């Protein structure tokens, strides 16, 4: 069994034979359902892009836990400069296997910076752990190539999709992404953290209809797969 816990905003904790964090923005996150010090036993930390609400506490948690940070090559180098005692693995889109976990870094339509300088390209991740396939979209707009993710790496057991609009897809666009990805389940994320990304997950659920099971998680709740 694999458990996918929503930590608020776009942060998730995946637990199976390995323990994986994605975009661990906890400090300063008004939705946060955990603290960095809660993760002393983590194997991998996946970071989709350099914005502070995604890179978050990745470096500090890696220090605490000894976890490896996986990120776009440029971002991995940036993290290594700030946290010289942390192991990073740089990628540049494509599949790999790290400690028995199959990971595909895939494109996302967004930006990636520290607020001043651009730091590599944004990404999403497809993770296969214990025969469960999870897609975390990162911050992105909908794009047709999402069909390829389903074709190459599907069936996708659960897709974690932003629905807040303004910086990412809104509910309508995310519902279209569900059509392209064909996941069995979908969890909305990246909404209602702050007013600019206000969205109604029930409206998203209505728009998705019977194309997938929409699971609306509150921060701290988990989905068992």
From Swiss-Prot:
Pfam families: Lactamase_B_3
Record's keyword terms, sorted: Hydrolase
Protein's UniProt keywords contain Hydrolase: yes
Protein family: Belongs to the UPF0173 family.
Keyword Cell membrane: no
Lineage top rank: taxon: Archaea
Alphabetical list of HAMAP family matching this protein: UPF0173
Name of the protein in its database record: UPF0173 metal-dependent hydrolase PH1671
MF annotations from Gene Ontology: hydrolase activity
